[in-house]
Design a protein with these regions (language model features):
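Short, well-structured alpha-helical segments that form the helix of a local strand-helix-strand
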Residues: 405-413
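Active-site rim segments in enzyme catalytic domains, especially the processed small/beta chain
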Residues: 77-83, 93-95, 252-305, 345, ...
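Helix-loop-helix junctions that connect adjacent transmembrane helices in secondary transporters/permeases
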Residues: 165-250, 414-493
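Flexible, low-hydrophobicity surface segments
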Residues: 1-178, 199-202, 277, 287
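Gly/Pro-rich active-site capping loops and adjacent beta-alpha segments
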Residues: 2, 73, 103-105, 110-113, ...
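Short, well-ordered beta-strand elements within core beta-sheets of diverse protein domains
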Residues: 35-48, 126-132, 380, 391, ...
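Active-site-proximal alpha-helical scaffold in enzymes
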Residues: 131-132, 276-282, 313-324
Length: 662
């Protein structure tokens, strides 16, 4: 089909988005809506001695000034961490990741209330919520809130926070070390290092970052008193998970919460975890009896959006005299911030520590440390880029140490196609790939062999020129369960409902191409349904390269279900046996005759024919609900070439080439 899988088509989303007809969170306004403003901590670490709100409440137009004490009094519960900190050991073993077991038993859970209660643990943590008729009034009222802090020494540096003498982020904890785990074979690894001809070492810090999506986080919440239901419209990475989390925080049944998100202006992982303002606007709406809207400003987003990376690594690589890798050992120290929101980046990075290279034995120590910083969560590949950076730097250091060309030392140690499936020392199994071919093709695209000439030309201009190469592998999985429903409507439209949620990935287009090919229906006839928990019962959202991989399977299963049910209805219509009905290009044909019915005719018959079996009557739809256990291992290679002006330090990326096998 010209609009099927792999065909170049115009994106379905763009016709709506380029004319400003998208429906983002800030486009939503409800009748009698109020505005909320969060007063945030100016301290990284401090006890809250008192909060005085009387002057703020007296300001005309102020409807409520709420604190952590009010929140606890109303029974609002902490924001739950992701499953990485709470999942039982046996459940973790069923996933493709390395299991990190804390040496001192179960992990301590750090209650993360939507507003700080007794103590603030990072700059930007919410301390009070002001609800007013307008945002300007709410901001003015926030300036009238008096907070008496007892400032405490903060622990912000990742390495220093892990030291025994560091200020305690949590008074009840013996140290700031939240997780202390190790994986691999220490004795065998140490012997390999003792016998090695060469050892290279790397100590590095991968800095903290945040996502900065084009659409800042926004939440519009409403409590409907007659039904007792909460409604939230907020851009996120997946509405179903957030529905469950909100129900947990508010202490209600999941069916009493509806979460909606239509167009999402970027994510990068920062929107996959629930933000404090999401339960706050719902709770505040119940308190004031009106809808409440919160819109995060860019300046406060830098303080209070979830953040990523922040990893201190100390790693060694052992080699024999011919440059073959013998072993790796080291430690990863992940700064998870003031609360134990996630250890996924640490776990993922350790899982694929060796990249696409053969490393016979290894031993790693993995630490997570709490600090007086914004919590970190899975962000843009969650720990894997850090691991790839570390491994590729070790390759370059090994080349310098041994005198072997940096490309040749990689070739000698790449996992070869005939060695796949390949099991790493930590038990992760790469299923397939051709890593050397990806490297070769990237180098060819980058014209690697002619680099010396280009560098000489730059030198004549007084410029420096450099080129670098990095091989990489991913481990995609994320939330392991996904769902889809495919429904063929008599009027010539196909509805495809999914539990994923696009934030710019183009699901309306790519998913429609898949279903168009499978059902043989026009690309234009397919409508994607997503982002509404009253319609979508199951789904993990979009993260970790899971959307097409998981939703594609579910959509394919559901499409097959529609075809098989349609075959039986078509057999009834054509007066033949189901085995004598062939399906092709959207039509069901009676074998050996010219008689046929289209899939939309079948959909109409399913609802109109009275002599159909009860099992075949009704809307022509099928569902698929699948739990996945196997990870995916996309891989590739990137080459970057830069030119630098040594007088000014100005850097220009003059060439970038990459091969990515998904």
């Amino acid at each position: 089909m010209k609009t099927g899988i792999g065909q170049p088509v115009r994106r379905k989303e763009d016709a709506r988005l380029v004319v400003g007809a998208g429906r983002f969170s800030d486009d939503v306004d409800l009748p009698r809506q109020t505005r909320a403003f969060v007063l945030r901590s100016c301290h990284a670490h401090a006890r809250i001695k008192s909060i005085t709100t009387e002057r703020a409440k007296a300001l005309k137009g102020v409807l409520a000034v709420l604190t952590g004490a009010d929140l606890k009094a109303d029974g609002v519960k902490p924001i739950p961490p992701d499953a990485s900190t709470t999942m039982p050991y046996e459940a973790q073993r069923r996933l493709p990741d390395v299991v990190l077991v804390h040496r001192d038993g179960p992990l301590m859970q750090t209650p993360y209330y939507p507003l700080a209660v007794d103590k603030v643990r990072y700059v930007g943590e919410g301390v009070a919520l002001v609800v007013a008729e307008t945002l300007a009034i709410a901001k003015d009222a926030a300036e009238l809130v008096d907070i008496d802090y007892e400032a405490l020494a903060p622990a912000t540096d990742t390495a220093l926070a892990a030291e025994a003498k560091a200020p305690r982020v949590w008074d009840e904890a013996p140290s700031n070390i939240f997780l202390d785990a190790e994986v691999g074979d220490a004795a065998t690894t140490d012997k390999a290092f003792a016998d090695a001809a060469h050892v290279v070492k790397l100590e590095t810090w991968v800095q903290r970052v945040t996502g900065v999506p084009m659409e800042a986080r926004t939440a519009v919440g409403n409590y409907d008193k007659p039904s007792g239901r909460y409604f939230l419209h907020a851009g996120s990475g997946g509405v179903v998970r957030q529905k469950g989390e909100l129900a947990s925080i508010l202490g209600v049944k999941p069916e009493d919460v509806r979460v909606v998100a239509y167009d999402i202006g970027g994510n990068f992982g920062t929107k996959n975890s629930i933000f404090a303002e999401f339960p706050l606007v719902l709770w505040a709406s119940k308190r004031v009896g009106r809808p409440v809207k919160f819109v995060c400003e860019r300046s406060e987003a830098f303080l209070s959006d979830y953040q990523g990376r922040d990893l201190v690594a100390k790693v060694e690589l052992a080699l024999d005299k011919r440059g073959h890798f013998l072993a790796m050992r080291g430690s990863h120290l992940s700064n998870i911030g003031g609360y134990s929101s996630s250890i996924v980046p640490l776990r993922k990075g350790v899982s694929i520590f060796s990249g696409v290279y053969r490393v016979p034995v290894a031993h790693y120590k993995a630490y997570a440390v709490v600090s007086n910083t914004m919590p970190t969560i899975p962000y843009r590949s969650a720990g894997r880029p850090e691991a790839m950076f570390i491994m590729e730097r070790l390759c370059d250091l090994a080349a310098l140490k041994t005198g072997i060309d940096r490309i040749e030392i990689r070739r000698r140690n790449l996992v070869a196609p005939e060695q796949l499936p390949y099991r790493t020392p930590f038990g992760v199994t790469y299923d397939n790939g051709n890593y050397e071919e990806a490297m070769n093709r990237s180098m060819a695209m980058a014209d690697w062999e002619e680099f010396r000439k280009r560098r000489a030309d730059s030198k004549k201009k007084g410029k420096l020129r450099g080129i670098g190469l990095a091989n990489y592998i991913e481990l995609t999985m994320g939330y392991p369960r996904e769902w889809s429903q495919v429904k063929v409507l008599p009027g010539g439209e196909v509805e495809v409902a999914v539990g994923t949620l696009s934030s710019g990935q183009g699901h309306e287009t790519s998913f429609a191409q898949c279903v168009s090919e499978w059902l043989g229906v026009p690309f234009e006839s397919i409508r994607l349904v997503q982002g509404d928990t009253d319609i979508i019962p199951v789904g993990g959202g979009s993260h970790s390269g899971r959307s097409m991989r998981m939703a594609g399977v579910c959509m394919g299963n559901a499409a097959n279900g529609v075809i098989e049910r349609s075959r039986q209805i078509a057999a009834h219509m054509l007066k033949v046996e189901p085995d004598d009905v062939e399906f092709s290009a959207g039509s069901f044909k009676a074998r050996g005759s010219g008689r046929a019915v289209g899939i939309f005719e079948v959909a109409r018959a399913a609802q109109e024919l009275n002599d159909l079996d009860d099992a075949l009557r009704g809307p022509l739809a099928a569902e698929s609900d699948v739990s996945f256990t196997a990870g995916g291992y996309p891989y590739g290679c990137a080459v970057c070439e830069v030119e630098i002006d040594p007088q000014t330090g100005a850097l220009e990326v003059v060439r970038y080439c990459a091969i990515d096998d998904v």
